[in-house]
Curated annotation (Swiss-Prot):
The chain crosses the membrane at residues 157-177. Residues 178-207 form a coiled coil. It catalyses: [protein]-peptidylproline (omega=180) = [protein]-peptidylproline (omega=0). Residues 47-136 form the PPIase FKBP-type domain. It is found in: Membrane. Residues 190-209 are annotated as: Disordered. It comes from the Eukaryota. PROSITE patterns: FKBP_PPIASE. One of its GO terms (biological process) is chaperone-mediated protein folding. This is FK506-binding protein 2B.
Length: 209
């Protein structure tokens, strides 16, 4: 009985270890160092220029294939512009300066079945330890502005969206006005026709008398 329990326990442990080693099929994002909301004045958005330190390893073996720390030179790129793998473009959104994350990236969001540079084999799941050092907001990235600045931004009455919406409102007003005018004319014509018919009937009755 004791042997059976030990065998069952061993099977469970082996299964658990095997499951832990099984590469994920979806992007996994873990926060290793969180920045307090009071200190996070800006978060990363698509279109921002980010400066980062990173270390990349293979999920299966843990072997390091690249690191900006070894070169002592941060990696600079534009988020969401296709300059990096999809796992980065998705996994680095909403990040604060000073924040550290761990990204586990499946092949379809990494380098696919082709691999890269002779150091990343095809179909490899990648692990990145990343730290955001600096954010330079994109030129037209309103979302990247501080909250107070967004609230103080004036409404542009010459913006295309404002002009289009105003044009639609004016067009709808003209259509409603024309429809109302046509209805008034139709009602007036009906009243005139009814009055004419009534007058004609009265004349016929007078002639009979």
């Amino acid at each position: 009985m004791r042997f059976s329990l030990l065998a069952l326990l061993g099977t469970i442990v082996a299964t658990s270890v095997s499951a832990l080693k099984e590469p994920p099929t979806q992007l996994q994002v873990g926060v290793k160092k969180r920045i307090p909301a009071s200190e996070c004045t800006r978060k990363s958005h698509s279109g921002d220029e980010l400066s980062m330190h990173y270390t990349g390893t293979l999920f299966d073996t843990g072997e390091k294939f690249d690191s900006s720390l070894d070169r002592n030179e941060p990696f600079v790129f534009t988020l969401g512009a296709g300059q990096v793998i999809q796992g980065w473009d998705q996994g680095l959104l909403g990040m604060c300066v000073g924040e550290k994350r761990r990204l586990v990236i499946p092949p379809h969001l990494g380098y696919g079945e082709r691999g890269a540079g002779g150091v990343i084999p095809g179909g490899a799941t990648l692990v990145f330890e990343v730290e955001l050092l600096e954010i330079k907001p994109g030129k037209y990235n309103q979302k990247a502005m501080p909250v107070q600045q967004q609230q103080e931004s004036p409404i542009s009455f010459t913006s295309p969206s404002f002009l289009v919406s105003t044009g639609i409102i004016v067009a709808l007003f003209l259509i409603v006005f024309k429809m109302a005018k046509k209805q008034d004319i139709a009602e007036a014509n009906e009243k005139a026709a009814a009055a004419t018919a009534e007058a004609s009937t009265e004349k016929k009755e007078e002639k009979k008398e």
